Structure formats: structure tokens, C-alpha cells
Amino acid sequence: MQLEDMVAAIEASGQYRILRRLNTDCSQLRPRDLFIEPGLIGTKLGGLLDCETTGTDPRTSEIIELAIVPFSYDGDGNILAIHQPYHRLREPSHPIPEAITQLTGIDDAMVAGQVIDLDELEAFIRPIELCTAHKASFDRKFAEGLSPAFASIAWACSVTQVPWREEGFESRALGYLSLKSGFYFDGHRATDDGVATVEILGRRLPRSGRTALSFLLEAAAQVTARVRAPNTPYERKDLLKARGYRWSDGSDGSPKAWWIDVPENRLNEELAFLKAEIYHRECNIPIRMITARDRFSVRAD
């Protein structure tokens, strides 16, 4: 009995689920049965960016590994093909913390003398229409710190802009999403994480039947308003929390205030809520309109 026949027999029993290892060797990648056949009309180029860094603060930490996995897609959110990725290591100005080495497997010896050629990088990303990351609020800030060319690209986030919970997923972690999608991979290396994320975006979600990418494209196209509520009465914080506001303590350089992002068509409703339920008066409330060109960047903070 062939291996695939054995797998089919085990799965048919209804007692087991099989996890397949995802091939992340992009030199062997081609349009797979998972995706529809590539076409030319309406095809766009996206890029899945992932970086490994020396820490979590883009003001003090540095990129040590950068990967961008390009993929072709259509306007309906179907992924047509995955293309050869960009991948580079980079030596930081300080030794890599041991905790980062344990997490990623990247040590000082691996990155010694390694640099990222910005001309090469910027030429690679020039055709990309939408840059996606699994937690874009992290990756975009690091990417723009490396090259200002990333600021001119529209960005999307596969963590926050896909309705994972509504589709039956209990976590948005990449490892969990891959296991629920029926495969596993070697995580915490930039290219592997990138290929795995593209794989997940191309699959149809269990409840809606739509691809994850279709939700991502829809969310990225929206104009949203970031509404800030500074100097609110302490006793009304629970009202803000219940409505979905988050607290910024200013430690990341953003204003110290409660804030929420709402669709443009809900802005007036949100302002009315703040004036009636929080401030109990007419007031000027700070608002910033945000598109995919600025979303997840320091400019949106």
C-alpha cells in the first residue's frame, strides 16, 4: 500500500487526523492543486513579509533575518501561485540575545558579515501591490526602519484582518492556524513562516467558504478612523473597554489615551457615544483617517 493510500484509509476511519509537513523549499514550489490555475487577467502581486529581530521594540531592536514571499492573486482573493522568495540574514550592531537564538536558531556566527543590500531589496519590492504580515503592526515598523520604500506600499495584517474566531479558530497564532489547516512546518524562521502564512491565506475557511485572503483584501481596502479619547474620567474606563477601546500608556511614542479603530461609516456614531456616555459634553475628539498606506505604521499611531 502506498503512503497516500495509507493516509486516506486512516482519515476515512474518522478516528484520526493527519498532519502533512508543508514543503517550504521555494525552489520546488509551483502552482499546486490547492490553488486555481494561474491566469493573466486581473492578476496582482502580493508579498508576505516576515522578519526575525533582536527584540520587540523597533526603536531599539534590529532585523537579523528578512524574508518576502511573493504570490500572485486575483481580485476574488484566490492565490494563483507562490514565487521565489527574497531571503537575507543581517548582522546587528550588538550580539543576538540568547533568548532570540533559542527561539529562532539564529546565532551571531550565522549573521557575521551579512548585510541587506537596500538597492536589491527595493528593486524586489517595487512590483508588490500589497505587503502582508502575520502581525503587521510589528513587521511594518521594522521594515520601514530598514528602508523607506516600504512606506509607499499598502499593507495588510493576517492576524487582525481575517475573522478567525468567527470561522471557528480559537487562536490566531500561526502554529495553531497551520495545525487546524492540516499541516505543520518549521516555525520561527522568516521564509518558513512566510510560506506557511501564504498557504493559510489561500485556503477556504470552514464556515464562510471564502479564502482568508479575500477577507484580508476587503479589510485592507477600507478607510478607518482612529478615534482617541484622552483625559477620560477613570470611573468610565469599563464602558470604554466594553466597547472595544484599548489603552495606550504612551510608552511607544503614541499619545496617552484610550483608542479604537472604526470603519469610516461608523465615525459619527462613535463620536456621539463618547460625547454622550464618556465626556457628557461637547468636545473636540482627536481623529486620524487611516488607509492601507499608513495602517500599522508609526504614522497611524
Task: Tell me the role of every PLM-derived stretch.
Residues 1-37, 203-301:
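Acidic two-metal-ion nuclease catalytic site recognized across multiple nuclease folds
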Residues 2-153, 171-187, 277, 281-284, ...:
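Conserved non-catalytic scaffold segment of RNase H-like nuclease domains
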Residues 114-119, 189-196, 250-261:
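Short linear loop/turn motifs
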Residues 128-146, 164-231:
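Acidic, Mg2+-coordinating catalytic module of metal-dependent nucleases/exonucleases
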Residues 151-164:
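Conserved beta-strand -> loop -> alpha-helix junction used to position metal-binding or nucleic-acid-contacting
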